[in-house]
From Swiss-Prot:
Functional note: ATP-binding RNA helicase involved in ribosome assembly.
UniProt domain Helicase C-terminal: residue ranges: 541-685
Higher taxonomy: Eukaryota, Fungi, Dikarya, Ascomycota, Pezizomycotina
Protein name stated in the entry: ATP-dependent RNA helicase drs1
Keyword Nucleus: yes
Length: 824
């Protein structure tokens, strides 16, 4: 029994740690179970090894103590020299502390090196950003490398500098050679006699010197006096002319009647449109009453109580509250206060609030709360969140994963630019929430065997008014007809439509309408500025932009363009002028687009309307509209990239005559809201100078574009080579894959793309150059002639022979033949 107790005590003393060899320990434990004799033998071996380890540790400890004592003695010796008598007392105290350490007494106090970690919430508050990409997600974008404009510009500038230095060296060498030749000539001429026969060698005060000079000076003095008299007469004459002009103006103003102001045709059209919008059809109003759920009437007391509510009062689970605290969300915004209780009840919602008011959290929080109570036996995808752009989907994915940090809810993002195979592998695990763009969602829905939509219970459409436009109509209909009809549907946007005919398509069931702010409102903290371009100065628009970016708004600026081609050209000009800029449009991937701007490496983000919706890029101070957008709704989304979540911001729009309608709508909405609106005046001469600088760089821009095109072609060729190698190497596997299908033909996709472009940039945006160009008079006449022939019923056109024969008074050849046949 005694031996068994000793062995038990020895086993209790032995503690498994991460540094121990687990395999050896497991083998020893297995050997212990073989028999009593084997167990005793193993126990003795273990004791022996432990004693050896303990002795080695004690020796090491003793060595460390000796080293420490030696160091302390040296320090104390130095202190004795400085302090004198106080040193021995300190030495005794140190020795007492060492004895206590040797005894190994534990007084229950925490080690000073111990750090308490609250689970990462504090760290996440500091570093939270909607654009943050986790380490695991960084490699999902593929190995595609884009052409770097900055590299091309820096290479070209380095070449130019080297060439300039070489030219300067050559010039210097030439000058030195010329100088040396001149010196040689001077040396050769040094021995020659100089003839001063024709020169005046008298002193200046000598007789006859300076006579010509005095005559010339007298003449110049006389001329100056005449000029002064003439200028005085001119001044008097100009004063008289001015007085005469003023008298004429007064007489004219008395005789002529005052002209009445005439409205601009665009103003008349915009007023008519606004009147039509304000007068809501009675039939439409009846439709809305029947379609939407009745709204609850709230008293002022209940409104005050709602304003004071916090997230704790929604009875949310502790993991959700902890996630909200982790991203520093303490009090809900108005849209969150209204949405969360209704969404938790499972009702359909149509929500609208100004940009930057927290709409993403308004639908993510109730979804997470409902998913905490899901059955966990079988993994199932229950939620689909659809976004119009991949950048917005990536941002929503990052926000949702941050809020769900302390839960077991899984997410998947299905967006373009990421590997299809990796997305399919994640879908096999049936994630709870799928955040996707419509195109990639349909692709997986049709072609991924592991993805099923039969179990979806919640559908969210963010930026729903954009999703309901013609460009997304076909894709949205395909999704809505495939997923279950018995679902909860939530629609959110800053400019949410309430047209019943559009909302019926989504399959809403008596939705609750949650309109927090008045329609077409901006944030209160936003200052709106407008720079007016006079007629005939539209070609100087780039000069105004360069002045604004170089002199006034120099950091954290988003510049919006209508077309990515123009954005790319301005990006090159910015690079040549030394302005650090990044691009964000459909041809760029998300990593290329925002990473430099988010990290502060680029001061300007040149974007199209792709980035105007929903994107929450941290610290944006200013938004500049290079051109006013197609509609007031797009303008609201653009300027909503700044002044978010209560922060201040500024929006500046460069507006010409064609932009009058949008500018007037923005000013009218801002004044009704009480927002600050200002007009910025830029001197035309300053703008012209910057425009001239941009024109000087036109050739350089073309060369950079051609070099970029060449690099893209090389990259494309390399990709084709790699593709060919893979086809040869993995031929069997590639041929065994089923062909990916789509619900539309290429013609239908092209038509949908045109409709989407027309929604953003007007009817002319989707047209080709041939369709856009103006018809010549010759073409117009040809079209008129063809129309007249069709109206007259004559389907043929007189040929050259017919016209010539009619001029000569002869019948056409065919008619002659017919006449001869008739005579016979």
């Amino acid at each position: 029994m005694a031996g068994t107790k000793k062995r038990a005590n020895a086993d209790d003393d032995f503690v498994l740690t991460l540094s121990d060899d687990e395999n050896d320990t497991l083998n020893q434990l297995e050997e212990e179970g073989e028999g009593d004799d084997g167990a005793l033998a193993t126990g003795s071996k273990t004791k022996k090894r432990k004693r050896d380890d303990a002795a080695a540790a004690q020796q090491e400890k003793g060595k460390n103590k000796k080293v420490k004592k030696q160091e302390q003695q040296q320090q104390q010796a130095q202190q004795k020299k400085k302090k004198g008598k106080n040193a021995p007392v300190q030495e005794e105290e140190d020795e007492d502390e060492e004895e206590e350490e040797d005894q190994g007494e534990d007084d229950g106090a925490l080690n000073s090196d111990f750090e308490f970690d609250v689970g990462g919430a504090a760290n996440e508050v500091r570093d939270f950003d909607g654009w943050e990409v986790n380490g695991n997600e960084e490699g999902k974008g593929g190995d595609k490398k884009a052409v770097d404009i900055d590299d091309i510009i820096s290479r070209r500038q380095a070449k130019k500098e080297a060439e300039l230095i070489r030219k300067q060296k050559k010039k210097k060498q030439k000058q030195e050679e010329e100088f040396s030749e001149l010196e040689d000539d001077d040396e050769e001429d040094g021995g020659m006699e100089v003839d001063f026969g024709d020169d005046e060698l008298l002193a200046e005060d000598g007789f006859g010197m300076g006579v010509d000079g005095e005559e010339e000076s007298e003449k110049s003095d006389a001329e100056d006096e005449e000029k002064e008299e003439g200028s005085d007469e001119e001044a008097e004459g100009s004063d008289e002319d001015e007085q005469m002009d003023e008298d004429d103006d007064d007489a004219a103003s008395d005789d002529d009647s005052v002209a009445t102001p005439v409205m601009h045709p665009d103003d008349i059209a915009s007023d008519r449109d606004s009147d039509e919008e304000s007068q809501v059809d009675a039939e439409e109003e009846e439709k809305r009453k029947a379609f939407f759920a009745p709204e609850e009437e709230k008293t002022s007391e209940s409104a005050m109580a709602d304003a004071k509510r916090s997230f704790q009062e929604f009875n949310l689970s502790r993991p959700i509250l902890r996630g909200l605290a982790g991203v520093n969300f303490s009090n809900p915004t108005p849209i969150q206060r209204k949405t969360i209780p209704v969404a938790l009840l499972g009702k359909d919602i149509v929500g609208s609030a100004v940009t930057g008011s927290g709409k993403t959290a308004a639908f993510v929080v109730p979804i997470l709360e409902r998913l905490l109570f899901r059955p966990r036996k079988v993994p199932t995808s229950r939620v689909a969140i659809l976004m119009p752009t991949r950048e917005l989907a990536v941002q929503c994915y990052n926000v949702a994963t941050k809020l769900a940090t302390y839960t077991d809810i899984t997410f998947c993002q299905l967006v373009g630019g990421f590997s299809l195979r990796e997305q399919e592998n994640i879908l096999k695990k049936r994630p709870d929430v799928i955040i996707a763009t419509p195109g990639r969602f349909i692709d997986h829905m049709r072609n991924s065997a592991s993805f099923t939509v039969d179990t979806l219970e919640i559908l969210v459409l963010d930026e729903a008014d954009r999703m309901l436009e013609d460009g997304f109509a076909d894709e949205l209909n395909e999704i809505l007809t495939t997923i279950p009809k018995s679902r909860q549907t939530m629609l959110f946007s800053a400019t949410m439509t309430d047209t019943v005919d559009k909302l019926i398509r989504v399959g809403l069931n008596r939705p609750v309408r949650l309109m927090v702010d008045a329609k077409k409102n901006t944030a209160v903290t936003l200052v709106q500025e407008f720079v007016r371009l006079r007629p005939g100065r539209e070609d100087k628009r780039l000069g105004y932009l360069l002045y604004l970016c170089k002199e006034i708004y120099t950091g954290r600026v988003i510049v919006f363009f209508r077309q990515k081609k123009e954005a790319h050209r301005v990006r090159i000009i910015f690079g040549l002028l030394g302005l650090k800029a990044a691009e964000l449009h459909g041809s760029m991937s998300q990593e290329q687009s925002v990473e430099n701007f988010r990290e502060g490496k680029a001061a300007f983000l040149l974007a199209t309307d792709l980035a105007s919706r929903g994107l929450d890029i941290k610290g944006v101070e200013t938004v500049i509209n290079y051109e006013a957008p197609q509609s007031h709704e797009i303008y609201l989304h653009r300027v909503g990239r700044t002044a978010r979540a209560g922060r201040s911001g500024r929006a500046c729009t460069i507006a010409a005559e064609p932009d009058r309608k949008v500018v007037k709508a923005a000013v009218k909405a801002g004044k009704s809201q009480g927002a600050k609106i200002a007009s910025r005046v830029i001197e035309p001469a300053v703008a012209d100078s910057w425009a001239a600088k941009a024109e000087e760089l036109a050739d350089e821009v073309e060369e950079v574009l051609s070099e970029e095109k060449l690099e893209k072609q090389l990259a494309q060729a390399e990709m084709q080579v790699t593709k060919g190698e893979n086809l040869i190497k993995h031929e069997a596997e590639i041929k065994s894959r089923p062909k990916r299908t789509w619900f539309e033909t290429e013609r239908d996709k092209k038509a949908a793309r045109k409709l989407g472009a027309a929604e953003l940039n007007g009817p002319d945006a989707g047209m080709s150059k041939k369709e856009k160009q103006k018809l010549s008079n010759k073409d117009k006449k040809r079209l008129d002639d063809s129309r007249q022939r069709q109206e007259a019923g004559a389907g043929w056109k007189k040929g050259r022979a017919t016209r010539e024969s009619m001029k000569n008074g002869q019948l056409p050849k065919a008619k002659k033949d017919n006449k001869k046949k008739g005579k016979k």
